[in-house]
């Protein structure tokens, strides 16, 4: 989701590098730092808190998760807007990877486990925090496919930045119900395997019963609705692709539908009656978004399910094939210039950012929450690519320059794996600026865009890790740049501060000494210095080097709009 939906962060040295988020930040960020350099100055990092047991139970890929591979969900629910309750079952299919008699599923303690059935017989289970440990009477064998029916019910408790599962009303007083659970997980409203690492490989079905007169819009392809004869109508959807747990969504309201086919892809849009005309104008931007992102990364990844935009009462969320939209049918982000440089008012930030997650976050998914920069850093960079596709590279550099003040440099982007905790917002802005810096180091746009496509194709429809992403880019760029990129990635992802180029001038002799101030041993990267029309590439290390220059100290520049670094002159 976008930070803007959360609150986005900026870029440091390179005042104009290149791109912004993927999922948005959930709420506007705190006031940007006044430091005009490369983001806020880093301070001492706080000692990491000991993870709570519940965070580990939810976040760790423990033995009773790792012993099975999720195949599909068949989710059937009934939602009561008056009682504010949900009830139903999830048919969970999985294949055993190691023999065992227990698996772990997840359901918030706020909801009841009514029963869990295997071939009609009740299974025993135990609960701890949100974990549900399901016990089988006989050992399940390696390769065995198992299907259980998990029945549940209760009154969901709204929580998290987006509400989890919330029962609201629209301006006309009609029920407006939604799920948004990236923070607290799918377990907040239905039983699931609440792990990004394992997606249902065969997809899922959703059958959602709501009072007559309301509509449910969920993920996947619409397969029809039917009256249940008791005042309820069931809306049926099928997801044809793997889907990460927090992307599964309900959107229930008095929706009006319109749509079209665009270059063979079905586009479906859902808005409240009073906003229908505004939606028909604003949602037309989806076609320009698709033009841009398919240009760089190839076809829309979920063509069998189609692309949808669904109006919601919060900023937005990247629900797979059913992108949630709440940006008030205005350009920018919630009626403001998101990056403060005059570019974002040209487009609807939520449509671009949240849809960008279809490629990075939904098709390519981080296996662990600690690797979430793969979603947010890359999607933020996609914002910049959208600007470049529409208005050119100069405007893209201007746009990314607005990210710099959003970077905080307080804690590393990468957090402890196996813990259900949100990484810092620097994963958006600092992540995007790091990616833009890679492009500047390569200094070959044609090759860069070929590599972007190859990178996406390699990881599409997979869950992956930071280590795998780094390994790919090391192999792709190392032979060209002729240095090991490991320290580069470690400095930006695993360290708090960004590198600072120290410059020491001896103007009498026309000399300047230079080196990198960086925590990471072995850190090096090229950077361009000089003055307009007289740029040269230098290759500093953590040891002093020198060069001759006729440029006065006051005029000597570092191209920080291309390279995300700080600069210190003495």
Put a short name on every predicted segment.
Residues 20-87, 172-178, 486-487:
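N-terminal, polar/Ser/Thr-rich
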Residues 89-110, 191-211, 467, 471, ...:
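Surface-exposed beta-strand/loop patches in extracellular or lumenal glycoproteins
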Residues 98, 301, 424-512:
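Amphipathic alpha-helical substructures
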Residues 108-170, 196, 230-231, 545-551:
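A surface-exposed beta-strand-loop module
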Residues 113-118, 217, 447, 481-486, ...:
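Beta-strand-rich binding/interaction modules
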Residues 149-255, 560-565:
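Extended, low-hydrophobicity, Ser/Thr/Pro/Gly-biased non-transmembrane segments
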Residues 179, 206, 233, 254-358, ...:
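Juxtacatalytic substrate-recognition/specificity segment
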Residues 240, 372, 376-441:
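Acidic/His/Gly-enriched intrinsically disordered linker/tail segments
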């Amino acid at each position: 989701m976008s930070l803007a939906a959360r609150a986005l962060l900026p870029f440091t040295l390179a005042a104009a590098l290149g791109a912004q988020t993927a999922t948005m930040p959930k709420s506007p960020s705190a006031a940007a730092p006044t430091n005009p350099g490369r983001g806020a100055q880093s301070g001492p990092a706080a000692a990491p808190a000991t993870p709570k047991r519940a965070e580990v139970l939810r976040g760790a890929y423990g033995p009773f998760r790792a012993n099975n591979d999720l195949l599909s969900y068949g989710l059937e629910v009934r939602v009561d807007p008056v009682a504010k309750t949900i009830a139903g079952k999830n048919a969970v299919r999985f294949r055993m990877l190691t023999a065992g008699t227990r698996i772990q599923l997840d359901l918030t303690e706020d909801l009841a486990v009514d029963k869990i059935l295997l071939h009609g017989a009740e299974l025993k289970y135990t609960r701890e925090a949100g974990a549900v440990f399901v016990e089988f009477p006989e050992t399940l064998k390696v390769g065995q496919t198992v299907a259980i029916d998990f029945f549940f019910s209760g009154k969901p408790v709204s929580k998290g930045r987006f509400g989890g599962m919330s029962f609201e009303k629209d301006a006309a007083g009609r029920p407006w119900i939604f799920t948004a659970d990236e923070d607290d997980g799918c377990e907040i409203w239905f039983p699931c395997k609440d792990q990004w690492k394992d997606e249902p490989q065969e997809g899922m079905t959703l059958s959602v019963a709501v009072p007559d007169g309301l509509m449910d819009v969920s993920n996947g392809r619409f397969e029809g609705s039917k009256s249940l004869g008791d005042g309820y109508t069931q809306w049926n959807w099928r997801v044809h692709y793997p889907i990460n747990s927090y992307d599964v969504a309900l959107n229930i309201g008095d929706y009006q539908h319109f749509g079209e086919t665009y270059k063979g892809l079905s586009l479906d849009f859902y808005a409240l009656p009073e906003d229908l005309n505004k939606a028909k104008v604003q949602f037309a931007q989806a076609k320009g978004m698709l033009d841009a992102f398919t240009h760089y990364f190839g076809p829309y990844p979920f063509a069998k399910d189609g692309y949808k935009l669904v109006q919601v009462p919060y900023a937005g969320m990247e629900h797979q094939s059913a992108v949630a939209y709440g940006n008030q049918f205005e350009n920018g982000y919630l009626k403001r210039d998101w990056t403060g440089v005059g570019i974002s008012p040209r487009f609807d930030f939520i449509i671009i950012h949240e849809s960008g997650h279809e490629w990075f976050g939904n098709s390519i998914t981080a296996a662990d929450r600690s690797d979430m920069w793969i979603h947010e850093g890359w999607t933020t960079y996609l914002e910049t690519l959208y600007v470049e596709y529409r208005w050119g590279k100069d405007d893209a550099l201007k746009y990314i320059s607005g990210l710099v003040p959003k970077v905080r440099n307080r804690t590393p982007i990468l957090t402890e794996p196996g813990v259900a905790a949100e990484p810092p917002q620097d994963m958006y802005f600092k992540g995007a600026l790091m990616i833009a810096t890679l492009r500047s180091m390569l200094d070959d746009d044609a090759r860069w865009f070929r590599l972007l496509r190859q990178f996406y194709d390699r990881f599409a429809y997979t869950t992956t890790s930071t280590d795998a992403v780094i390994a790919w880019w090391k192999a792709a760029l190392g032979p060209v740049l002729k240095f090991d990129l490991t320290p580069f990635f470690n400095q930006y992802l695993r360290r708090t501060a960004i590198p600072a180029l120290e410059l020491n001038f001896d103007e009498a002799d026309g000399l300047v000494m230079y080196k990198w101030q960086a925590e990471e041993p072995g850190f090096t990267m090229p950077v361009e210095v000089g003055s307009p029309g007289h740029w040269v590439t230098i290759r500093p290390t953590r040891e002093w080097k020198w060069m001759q220059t006729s440029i006065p100290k006051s005029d000597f520049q570092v191209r920080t709009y291309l390279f995300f670094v700080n600069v210190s002159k003495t």
